[in-house]
Amino acid sequence: MKKIIIAMMAAVSLLNFSGCDSLDMEPVSSISDANYWKSPDQFKAFNIGLHGLLRSQSSYNIFVLGEPRSDIYGDQPFGGEATQGVERFSYNTINAEFTGISNFANFYTTLNQINLMIRRTNETDLLGEAEKNYYLGQAYGLRAYIYFHLLRSWGDVIITTEPTLGSELDISHLDKAASPASEVMDLIKKDIDASEKAFGGDYSYKQGKCYWSKPATLMLKGEVYLWSGRQMGGGTGDYTVAKTALQDLQQNGNLKLQEKFTDVFSFNNKENSEMIFALHSGKEDDFMMWRDYNWRNNMVPQREYMAGYCDETGTPFLEIPGYNLQGLMRYQVKKDHYLKSFREGDTRLKGTLKAVYKKHEDGTLEYIAPIQYKFQGTTLEGSNERSWYDDYPIYRYADALLLLAEAKALLGEDPSTEINAVRERAYGSEYFNAHKNEVAYPNDKGSFYNDNPFEAGDENVMEAILKERLREFFFEGKRWYDLRRF
């Protein structure tokens, strides 16, 4: 079969990324591999397609693999929705009959196209050296990122580093044994090294922060070596590599925390100074977060029943200016998170969760449950409901700081600077400085943590970092991996 269908290229027409360099080309699903790769523009378009394929195939799966099995969810939806199987994640009752995710989260579809990009880019003489190396840096980084998800979720998985092309397909040898997790980790580290080498000294976000970059590779390197150090016996040597990578990112990534926590996720503040790599959503290609239906049908309450509830001021939700949510909520955040996961003064509470109350005839309010309030989308002109055109963060600078704190703590060093940078932003400088004896590391202790099912005081540095990661990364697909790593 000589003609090879490049199916992922159909994504190109959908990828006029806002704020990201893009190339408007018609879909080329009918173009054969032999007739493609004839110009620099075709390499550019294929690279756009790779990022679009990761977004369309796996954005929701990245969340599912990294969060619902943790301690964030598990209550019954207060609105009465049927959970339709997603409760198996929080109850950890997935099995051979209900795996939760099929086909390895569709990652191998994207991997095959990455492998093709690597091969053709290495072979070509159509690209200048800098452009060629940048594409290779992105491709090797993306491949390592995907295999890191596969490793953490499945352990032993099939390794494939060459594209499956029809002209090379041997149908008598389609089966391939899974490789041990140790070999998967070796490949991940090898690809990270290849990505770093290809990027060289180029730390730029050349095509925007919805494309892979050297800062993204350094973030991944820090995370990978912390995992291998703690989970796979790498120990001090791996912690040192992680620390060095994260300090390199800190010094050269041109990053800083946003002044306000809510600004990080604002629809009108995309690709801000804190973002490193995000999955883009935008009006221009009509792609909403998690392909819209996965977000809207899992995380958003129905308008009809919200008419019977109010906020903490007693204002009915349907009378709140700008409140126009409409969906289904199958992932119910545990009720106690609103009460026990954030200290007084922490702005991340209201930037993450919204409390739902029932107002009784005597005017008293009864707390019912929290809803997701980190990603708020936007209301388009002429629409009567919100559209989730928010970018979905994969890596951001607060994550880098807390990973660096973790590496330092594991090496017996003082992580106060990194932890307190995140906390100061969370509380605001004025409140933080006035209450350092209560909220600055290592002072966040006391009765708040008595019988707290989610967090502990600062007496243990690892508990302090894990606590900060919970408060910072709700809904960003990290908690399950964090619990396992710690």
Question: Each predicted region: which residue ranges?
Answer:
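Membrane-proximal, proline-rich intrinsically disordered regions
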Residues: 20-67
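Bacterial Sec-dependent N-terminal signal peptides
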Residues: 1-29
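Short, surface-exposed recognition loops and adjoining beta-strand edges that mediate ligand/DNA contacts
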Residues: 34, 61-80, 160-163, 200-219, ...
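Alpha-helical solenoid scaffolds that mediate protein-protein interactions
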Residues: 117-121, 150-151, 195, 242, ...
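Conserved, well-structured interaction surfaces
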Residues: 40, 44-57, 81-154, 175-186, ...
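Elongated scaffold/linker segments in the mid-to-C-terminal portions of large proteins
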Residues: 41-42, 47, 51-60, 73, ...
